[in-house]
């Protein structure tokens, strides 16, 4: 992404970001070269069209543990607030459903799961549609137990 000049610095948040339109053009061009592709990242709903997608797996994680991770990465408070709020509200899930439709979405809480467990659950969901679930994760109800998170998302 950096080599292709798709990345810029968001000075307000103190982080790198990408030019969505440029990334979309590059990704669509690259996708034509392959039959099967796995794309990771929260930007999929903004870079892909429904016809390019067979299945979307939305990985969720407890905001409490995300907060810890973001602090370890030295994210700015603005970036932490943006990411935590997005997870609490389920923005990536919402945008994925809106873009690709519920039938193409699987959602997993990865908070206490190992990579091996997540892969096992994914394979089960691929083989058995009854294991495909969305909308079961509710971080809002956990906020009252985490004062630091509550303060963080209160404006």
Please place each PLM-identified region on the residue numbering.
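Conserved acidic residues
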Residues: 35-36, 54, 105
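Flexible phosphate-sensing "switch/lid" loops adjacent to ATP/NTP-binding sites
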Residues: 2-22, 78-84, 116-131
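NTP-dependent small-molecule kinase module
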Residues: 97-155
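ATP-dependent small-molecule kinase phosphotransfer cores
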Residues: 1-48, 144
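ATP-dependent NMP and nucleoside kinases share a basic, alpha-helical "lid"
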Residues: 41-79
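Small/polar loops that bind or transfer phosphate-bearing groups
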Residues: 40, 58-59, 84, 109-110
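Short, hinge-like loop/turn segments at secondary-structure boundaries
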Residues: 9-14, 56-58, 98
């Amino acid at each position: 992404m950096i080599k292709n000049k798709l990345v810029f610095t968001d000075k307000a948040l103190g982080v790198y970001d990408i030019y969505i339109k440029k990334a979309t053009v590059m990704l669509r061009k690259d996708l034509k070269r392959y039959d099967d592709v796995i794309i990771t990242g929260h930007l999929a709903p903004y870079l892909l069209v429904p016809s390019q997608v067979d299945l979307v797996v939305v990985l969720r994680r407890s905001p409490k543990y995300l907060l810890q991770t973001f602090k370890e990465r030295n994210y700015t408070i603005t970036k932490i607030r943006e990411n935590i709020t997005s997870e609490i509200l389920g923005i990536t899930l919402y945008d994925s459903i809106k873009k690709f439709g519920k039938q193409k979405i699987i959602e997993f809480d990865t908070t206490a799961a190992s990579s091996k467990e997540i892969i096992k659950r994914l394979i089960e969901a691929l083989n058995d549609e009854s294991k495909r679930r969305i909308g079961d994760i509710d971080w809002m109800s956990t906020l009252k137990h985490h004062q630091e998170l509550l303060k963080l998302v209160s404006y």
